[in-house]
């Protein structure tokens, strides 16, 4: 039982941090010998709960994120997103998505409303997406244009265009992103501007529903 508790403690530490943690950092935070932490991490890595990153540290693995995905479905952002995604898909004719930050370098899709077109963007629910190469990732990082949205064409996946805008929480921080994705051949430059306005509108409504401060609000 002690080993199980220690493993849970390590997963909790990784889940609380958006930055990858080194072996020594985890050992120090958990107050455990480095050898013990190394052994536990090896087991957790084999099970998919932990993954190594390029810099040599450790981060939450896919299975841990999937469990988190299941848990977050009971939270308000997931629940209130349904109407916004439905409207985005209906008004654009394309797939609408809700994404959140998974860790320091990735976003993850929590929910989608799929386009009615026979050819549409495939479901990426539960998939880790790099922040720097995706529209939702850039939106989550606050990197939007003067109109409040960001568009990416053929960056992560050839033939796919995405338009995203950030959703803000009660404290004003970015807590999620809404996006529209579809085949690049079907989304013109004019569509990008139109879809961008739609995403910004729905993101603002979602932010207000979450209690985000509005313009001029000093909260």
Question: For each of these PLM feature ranges, what is it?
Answer:
Residues 30, 41, 85, 196-199, ...:
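Short amphipathic alpha-helical/adjacent loop interface patches that line ligand
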């Amino acid at each position: 039982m002690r080993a199980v508790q220690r493993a849970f403690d390590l997963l909790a530490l990784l889940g609380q941090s958006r930055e990858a943690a080194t072996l020594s950092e985890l050992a120090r935070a958990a107050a455990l010998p480095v050898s013990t932490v190394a052994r536990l991490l090896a087991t957790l890595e084999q099970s998919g709960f932990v993954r190594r990153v390029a810099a040599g540290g450790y981060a939450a693995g896919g299975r841990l994120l999937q469990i988190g995905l299941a848990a977050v479905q009971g939270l308000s952002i997931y629940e209130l997103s349904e109407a916004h995604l439905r409207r985005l898909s209906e008004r654009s004719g394309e797939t609408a998505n809700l994404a959140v930050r998974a860790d320091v370098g990735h976003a993850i899709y929590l929910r989608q409303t799929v386009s009615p077109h026979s050819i549409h963007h495939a479901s990426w629910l539960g998939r880790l997406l790099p922040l720097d190469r995706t529209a939702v990732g850039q939106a989550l990082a606050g990197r939007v244009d003067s109109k409040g949205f960001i568009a990416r064409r053929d960056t992560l996946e050839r033939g796919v265009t995405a338009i995203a805008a950030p959703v803000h929480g009660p404290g004003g921080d970015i807590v999620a992103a809404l996006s529209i994705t579809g085949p690049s051949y079907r989304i013109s430059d004019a569509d990008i501007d139109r879809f961008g306005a739609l995403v910004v509108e729905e993101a603002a409504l979602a932010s207000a529903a979450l209690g985000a401060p509005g313009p001029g609000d000093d909260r």
